[in-house]
Amino acid sequence: MTQLEQLMRRNFLEYASYVVMDRAIPDIRDGLKPVQRRILNTLFEMDDGRFHKVANVIGETMKLHPHGDAAIRDALVVLANKRYFIERQGNFGNLLTGHPAAAPRYIECRLTPLARETLFNVPLTEYAPSYDGRKKEPVSLPSKLPVLLMQGPEGIAVGMATKTLPHNLTELLQAQIDLLNGKEVRVLPDFPQGGLMDPAEYDDGRGKIRVRAKIEPRGDKTAVVSELPYGVTTESLIASIENASQKGQIKIGEIHDYTTDTVEIEIQFPRGTYVEEAIPQLYAYTDAEVSVSSSIVAICGDRPEQLSVTQVLGFLTDQLLEQIRAELEWEKSQLEDKRHFLTLERIFVEERVYKRIEEAKTDKDVRAEVWDGMHAYEDRFARPMIKDDIDRLLQIKIRRISRFDIEKHKKDLEEIHRQIEEIVRKLADLKGTTIGWIEGVIEKFGGEWPRRTSMTSFTTVDKKEVARADIRLSYDPETGFYGSKVRGSRFEIEVSPYDKVLIVTQDGMYRIIAPPEKTLIPGKVLFCAKHDAEEGIGFTVVYRDADRVAWAKRVVIKTFIKDKEYSLIPGGPDDRARLEILTRRPDPGKVHLKFLPAKRQRVKEGTFDLNDLIVKGVTSRGNRLSPKPVSSVKLIRG
């Protein structure tokens, strides 16, 4: 058992680590999951400017991906529908309707100009062997964009999940400029479906947002949905509307879906229902309003971390500075190499060093003559000469030597020198250089992705307030049943599913219940009505206690525990204590009492004014009308 436990612990840890690191959670550096990175790298290697069959791209990616083609296909379609890095041709499905993409053999794709310009740089990319060792794949792409926040990846791993909401490219880049300038930033999500968003609880990517469909009235009887909430399709929205209609939460006449590249759902309402009351009901009971939580989890170094939007932007901005610096230094080193060789080439031709090899007998002698001949002009070198430089000089063809143009060569060197000085200047002002690069991307590509989601503040739609009071309740005194499926003649009321009903029975007991379909009420019902917990329901109560002494009180029933029985008679009813009068009249009038006969009794009856009573608690005894036992109680209307 111990060996099995150790085996399970080790294998589970390896499996969990693999799912987290190699499948479900994106890397903060390039914002990509491994399968996405392999797809983009494959497209980069295949890139010739033309479209490629998706089936072919999947096949090439399979050389790097240790899993099935379905995962590659699904990931490619998702990437393509983000529209940042993959240009589509053919039916890639519809994010608005939820329709799937066509088969891979029928659709084509290629890298977008944005991807070519910002994601790849082979000399600065770290590679690792693929799963079978036959090929190499990038450890991460040298992306210069905040891809993690742009795309909004989702993933479920062992013991954790990530759900990053997508943000607007231009706003992210502008936020990076603000960070470089030492300003505070606040970036909010932006969704391709558009819609309305209340970001009050976003909490920098650690909270949630509420999103709504954009619904506008068209006349008194029609509403049109023109934008969807994030994660909702036209099919799921229509299904939720139909479901709410079946439950009686909203009345719908007809629904017409005219969605193509833009959303257009026309909702028609029946007689008696108007747009002004129906739109809040749509937000309350359907997917026209949803809440979306955000949890940004990404691989940082060798482990997953939960981050905020500001933390991610800060990391990626620092990374961008380093990438710009690395690119400039690599470009500078390439120019210095070119300047060095052009200088050697000029000396080799202009000073006729090549003439020294005419008498050399062996390869060793040739190399020695070139080495010695070149070092005679060592003071003109851009940097020390190495043996590889000799090989390059010896590869210069005679035709090139004979056509050597000193003036052109001099201009080429001057241009290289100018470019190196420009790079040195950019490196000296790395922050300004980075800001300039970001501004260039915004100018070139920002217009392609304008903000689609409008930010606003929602007033929470209270389902109780917009619920339709279309449940008809009634009481059948012959059977004692009460509810919506009872055909009775007493206490007919119309309520909503969120209302509560107060029922008082002849024994002085009362209960507050939800609208039932059919329930048996023990005892004869004296009162039944919709109950408002804020206002309450007031009664004037007259009862006799166990000693048959009459008491009266005025009460207001407000607080309650649903379905719990309460008594208007302190101590509860018994064989002798009983409820005599229950009235809701604000001026209940007077009560006439007849006393039980007794020896030497002079007063046999009395009348008492109930209008003088003050409101007391439900459990209070009330006011004693007389200390004498009572034989009968009768209400006299004043």
Where would I find each of the regions flagged by the language model?
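Catalytic phosphate-handling regions of large nucleic-acid enzymes and associated NTPases
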Residues: 1-206, 266
